[in-house]
Regions:
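Residue-level signal for functionally critical sites in structured catalytic/ligand-binding pockets
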Residues: 16-19, 86, 110
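Catalytic metal-binding/acid-base residues of hydrolase active sites
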Residues: 13-14, 54-56, 88-92, 113-114
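Binuclear metal-dependent phosphoesterase catalytic core
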Residues: 2-3, 74-83, 90-123
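Conserved catalytic scaffold of divalent metal-dependent phosphoesterases
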Residues: 1-67, 71
Length: 123
C-alpha cells in the first residue's frame, strides 16, 4: 500500500525452461495467488495489479514464453482493480503490440520501457 493505494505485484512469466527461476506454470501461479488470499481479504482487494507477464488473452502472444496467465484474468474478474499493468511483451515483437486495452472495466497498460498513469484514473 502506498498513500492509500493498494498495489499487488506478481513477478514471473510462463514456464518455458523447466526449473528456470521466475518462470511458473499456470498451476504454480494459481498457488502463489492462493497464498495471498488472507492479505487480499484483509485489505479488501487491491487497486492496481502489477505483473511481469500479461494475462491470458489480454495483450499476450501465442508463443509459450509470452503467453499470459489465466490466474491474472481470474484476479481481475474477482477484484476489479482500476489498473492492470504488465510488461514482458515488447513493442518490437510485432504489429499486435497494444499499449492500452481494457479487461472488463479494468484499464490494461503494457508498460514496455515505461508508462506514466494518473491515479485515480481520469474518466
Amino acid at each position: 500500500e502506498y498513500k492509500g493505494v493498494r498495489i499487488l505485484g506478481l513477478g514471473g512469466c510462463m514456464q518455458y525452461i523447466p526449473g528456470a527461476e521466475n518462470q511458473y506454470t499456470e498451476r504454480d501461479m494459481h498457488a502463489r495467488i492462493r497464498k495471498l488470499r488472507w492479505k487480499l481479504w484483509r485489505k479488501k482487494g487491491f487497486d492496481i495489479l502489477v505483473t511481469h507477464a500479461p494475462a491470458k488473452g489480454v495483450n499476450d502472444m501465442e508463443d509459450l514464453p509470452h503467453q499470459g496467465f489465466q490466474a491474472f484474468c481470474d484476479l481481475i474478474k474477482k477484484y476489479v482493480p482500476a489498473y492492470f499493468i504488465h510488461g514482458h511483451v515488447h513493442a518490437n515483437y510485432g504489429s499486435s503490440f497494444k499499449r492500452k486495452d481494457t479487461y472488463g472495466s479494468t484499464r490494461v497498460i503494457n508498460a514496455y520501457e515505461f508508462y506514466v498513469i494518473d491515479y485515480p484514473p481520469e474518466e
